[in-house]
Amino acid sequence: MRLALCLGAILLAAASAAPAQDFPRRPIRFVVPLPPGGSPDLTARTISSGLSGPWQQQIVVDNRPGAHHNLAAEIVARSNPDGYTWLLTTDNILTVNPHIEKVSFDPFKDFTPVTQHARILFLLVVHPSVPAKSVQELVALAKARPGALNYGSSGNGSPQHLGTSMLQYYAGIQMLHVPYKGAAPAINDLLPGRIQVWIGAANSLLPHIKDGRVRLLAAASSKRSPLLPDTPTIAESGYPGYALDIWLGVTMPANVPAPIVAKVSAGIAQVLNVPEVKAKLAPQGVDIETTSPQALARLIRDDYERWGKIIKAAGIKGD
């Protein structure tokens, strides 16, 4: 009897491992919720090119922007749980959007976490016409003239909107929100001073900081960036607890077999945790940080709860 039980356990373990040993046997679809060219797309293509060779299968990046990234999420949530459809998961999809708009997916039940793989540096800048050279000076200016300063975002509920709303909440200030349809048109209005305050991705701001068209005040992340080690964070500038840590990860549909999840998670970590890859992505404000599936699941849960409180307190609504 014991021999039969042992043999059964061995066969069950072998059957569970088999999907991962044979995986992948056909091309993989990697759905990205943004257009080509930005930092998230760059990380997806780095993963794709890094794994396609060793796995001897194409990983096809499929850019599906739209509906605040929800379109891509819906595609993946409805896919077969066989490991052949991945979602480049921006943090807002699962932790912000469900709080501010109606979504057709459950952030906890409809996805399998695979790995967090990067953080994107966001910066607080002002137009040079704004007489503030630090976060403290900006806050003092905003307090002296409530509602006189304006700030841009790429839309209601966007990282820019959330990050600036969080600053207003922590600092007790009020600025006028000017939402745009995307970051590019907002930055086009920031450069001539039509909008005055902006929290946005470093890769889109660094050239303008360098040529003096915008003034850098602080990093919005929880800790200083190696890319800008002398730039203080907003938290260091008098607002402990402030953190706009924009992360990227990979998820799949719910119920993907654990051995496949483990293989994909390990493969992504192997591709990205290479000094040359990190050096290539760092100037774009991309900090590689890979985690286990379990750690990503905890991050999604924690950020969902944190953003829920901030969104409620700040009265943030979707479009």
What are these regions (language model features)?
Residues 1-6:
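Bacterial N-terminal signal peptides that target proteins for export
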Residues 25-27, 169-170, 210, 233-236, ...:
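An extracytoplasmic/periplasmic, membrane-proximal ligand-sensing/linker region
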Residues 42, 46, 50, 71, ...:
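Extracytoplasmic/secreted proteins, especially bacterial periplasmic and envelope-associated proteins
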Residues 20-110, 148-150, 156, 172-201, ...:
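N-terminal (or domain-start) structured segment
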Residues 13-17:
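N-terminal signal peptide c-region/cleavage motif recognized by signal peptidases
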Residues 92-102, 161, 168-170, 197-231, ...:
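A ligand-binding cleft/hinge motif common to bilobed small-molecule-binding domains
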Residues 78-84, 91, 98-185, 234, ...:
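Hinge/capping helix and adjacent helix->loop/strand transition within the periplasmic-binding protein
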